[in-house]
UniProtKB/Swiss-Prot annotation:
Consists of 3 domains; the N-terminus binds the ribosome, the middle domain has PPIase activity, while the C-terminus has intrinsic chaperone activity on its own. The lineage of its organism: Bacteria, Bacillati, Bacillota, Bacilli, Lactobacillales. Belongs to the FKBP-type PPIase family. Tig subfamily. It comes from Limosilactobacillus fermentum (strain NBRC 3956 / LMG 18251). It catalyses: [protein]-peptidylproline (omega=180) = [protein]-peptidylproline (omega=0). It is an enzyme of class 5 (isomerase). This is Trigger factor. Involved in protein export. Acts as a chaperone by maintaining the newly synthesized protein in an open conformation. Functions as a peptidyl-prolyl cis-trans isomerase. Its EC number is 5.2.1.8. Keywords: Cell cycle, Cell division, Chaperone, Cytoplasm, Isomerase, Rotamase.
Length: 435
């Protein structure tokens, strides 16, 4: 196969010229005739049985060329781009330059390819200093969260409701004496001070006891989501059925055992909480260092203009992953759009706004892979398969079938590039001051 690649000097695209040999062409013509023969009728012959010579006399072999080209072009194009060593990022625009009988066919394809990257410094990036220390106050705060989670609601028999208490109420609202949709409920549990209701509602229940009827006068905010109620005064008739207060458990060994069956004392729980917080801070610090170092490396690099096809592919991929994630969590995307008053196009635009940054980042990481000669070994691939199988609850054979080796190697090499950039980064207070 004769292949010639001429890259444009001012954009990530070029012209690929390639030939299709006569043997391949003849096979394509033969297949085209077989398909055509089945659907044509010629006087004197049964449908589907016209001889090749008669067909050629009546229609000419050239009538099969376009069908034959459609048959052989995909494989010929794939072979040509492989020989040229290019990575197309969009469907090519193919033109036939010559299609003569008995001669190789010559074609040209206008091909958009990955932009070239000129790397700057990517090792030793200055990143904000990360604080991974865990204080006693951090531990105390986490223990207090656990106390809140273990709290019980206890009835206040003859005591007034206070901020933080839970009241069980019936309420019915009206504006100018008229009831409105969503303005009433029975046996509703409301935490006073939570800000769940419109401003002023919860405050007016503080100081009242179970069994009391309370008139609550409020004004809907000007920016209230129901436009017909925005800015209007409303009266709510409220009946208080119960008042409950939160009782927190004592911070002692019994509490520790209730919270975590693997510990026996409060001291052990504190140590375990401190270790968990330490792990969380170190993981967050690692992620922050990676993000900052990669961002700096990307800023130091230069790329050609990114083809629109790459931006569109990235946007579509992000959108589909997001929608798939919704469905995995049991969320109906159409219901989500209805509730949030958005559309799929709104979501697509959000992803499109950051597509250039994501694509450039990936291009730079791929360039680092080449520059640093980072390769995925057989052991790397096997470990990646094992990790993915564990992560998704699949067997390793299923993972191997779902992902090609090229995909696995690419992901591994990108991770190695990320590690190389992040591990060589320098944490400095100066970088933190810049932020």
């Amino acid at each position: 196969m004769s292949v010639k690649w001429e890259r444009d000097s001012d954009a990530p695209k070029g012209t690929l010229t390639f030939d299709i040999d006569t043997e391949t062409i003849q096979k394509g013509i033969d297949h085209a005739f077989t398909r055509t023969q089945k659907r044509i009728s010629v006087p004197g012959f049964r449908k589907g049985h016209v001889p090749r010579t008669i067909f050629n006399q009546m229609y000419g072999e050239e009538s099969l060329y376009q069908d034959a080209l459609n048959d052989v072009l995909p494989d010929a194009y794939e072979a040509a781009i492989k020989e040229a060593g290019i990575e197309p990022v969009d469907q090519p625009q193919v033109n036939v330059e010559s299609m003569e009988k008995g001669q190789p066919w010559t074609l040209t394809a206008t091909v958009a390819v990955k932009p070239e990257v000129t790397l700057g410094d990517y090792k030793g990036m200055e990143v904000p200093e990360q604080d991974t220390s865990v204080s006693d106050a951090d531990v105390d705060s986490e223990l207090e969260n656990k106390r809140q989670q273990q709290a019980e609601l206890v009835l206040k028999e003859d005591e007034a409701a206070a901020d933080g208490d839970t009241v069980v109420i019936d309420y019915e609202g009206s504006v100018d004496g008229e009831k409105f949709d969503g303005g009433s409920a029975d046996n509703y549990s409301l935490v006073l001070g939570s800000g769940s209701f419109i401003p002023g509602f919860e405050d007016q229940l503080v100081g009242h006891k179970a069994g009391e009827d309370v008139d609550v006068n409020v004004t809907f905010p000007e920016d209230y989501h129901a436009k017909d109620l925005a800015g209007k005064d409303a009266l709510f008739k409220v009946k208080i059925h119960e008042v409950k207060e939160k009782q927190l458990p004592e911070l002692d060994d019994e509490f520790a055992k209730d919270v975590d069956e693997d510990v026996e004392t409060l001291a052990e729980l504190k140590d375990k909480v401190k270790k968990q917080l330490q792990d969380q801070k170190e993981a967050a610090a690692k992620a922050a260092i990676e993000d900052a170092a990669i961002e700096a490396a990307v800023a130091n690099a230069e790329t050609e203009e990114i083809p629109q096809a790459m931006l569109d592919d990235d946007t579509n991929r992000q959108l589909q992953q997001y929608l798939a994630g919704m469905q995995q969590q049991g969320i109906n995307p159409q219901m989500y759009f209805q509730i949030t008053n958005t559309t799929e196009d709104d979501l697509r635009k959000q992803f499109a706004d950051d597509a250039a940054k994501r694509v450039k980042t990936n291009l730079v990481l791929e360039a680092v892979v080449k520059d640093a000669n980072l390769n995925a070994t057989d052991e790397d691939v096997q470990n990646e398969i094992a990790d993915l199988a564990k992560q998704y609850g699949m067997d390793e054979e299923a993972v191997s079938k779902a992902l090609t080796r090229d995909m696995l190697e690419h992901d591994i090499e990108i991770k190695k590039a990320v590690d190389l950039i992040a591990d060589s980064a320098k944490q400095t207070a100066k970088a933190a001051d810049k932020d």
